[in-house]
Amino acid sequence: NYLVCECWTDQNTYAKYYESGVDSMFDFAFADKSGIIANVMNGKASATSYAKNLETEQGMYAQYNPDYINAPFYTNHDMGRSAGYYAGENSEAQTKMGNALNLLMNGNVFLYYGEELGMKGSGKDENKRAPMYWNKDGNAEGMCKGPADMDDFRMKFDSLEEQQEDPDSIYNYVKQVIRVRNQNPVIARGTTAYLEQYSGEQCFALTRSDEN
């Protein structure tokens, strides 16, 4: 059996829940529009802060449960979707990189549906739970209706059908990152070491290693 739990609070508080023996806790410190990933991508925090926090949180969690498995995520059904965190000409690149920073964390990573497309959805909860954007035609086969009180809004990026045909799309970028993760199990299972001498405001360096 595997159990992952949610405690939407500060990192020091949810870290203590590992003492209960639970396998995983959702890692809220890196998630949402005010989390570490979005702050780095928006220039509100240094790139170094991402790597430093990856290294630091290992000891924070292990002190309560040496066998913990981190549960990173970027957004969920209660948060605005990450494509809405970024504006301007670099927003697509930021959306891609933000997904990569989540997907390359260690542990068991969670990806909320539609993040791989850069779907929009913010404000009231119904908007955050918009139906999967399979096709730009809302009446196409397989398309679902959104929650009854969802606002009528346009997506920022193309549908899955369109992105599948574009090698440079967010969807295909995310697929490539997941492929790299799956081909290198040490990414999920290894220990992170932050390399200060190679890191700074705009870039970071780290290693991920295990006994092999």
Label each residue range with its predicted role.
Residues 21-23, 67, 127:
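Short, solvent-exposed loop/turn segments at the edges of secondary structure
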Residues 42-66:
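Glycoside hydrolase catalytic-domain groove-lining segments
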Residues 8-9, 25, 31, 35, ...:
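Loop/helix patches that line or flank the sugar-binding groove of alpha-linked glycan CAZymes
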Residues 14-17, 122-124:
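A short acidic (Asp/Glu
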Residues 2-3, 67-69, 106-110:
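Loop/turn elements at helix/coil->beta-strand transitions in domains of secreted/extracellular proteins
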Residues 1-11, 17:
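Acidic/aromatic-lined carbohydrate-recognition and catalytic surfaces
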Residues 17-20, 41-44:
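Short, surface-exposed amphipathic charged segments that create phosphate/polyanion-binding patches used
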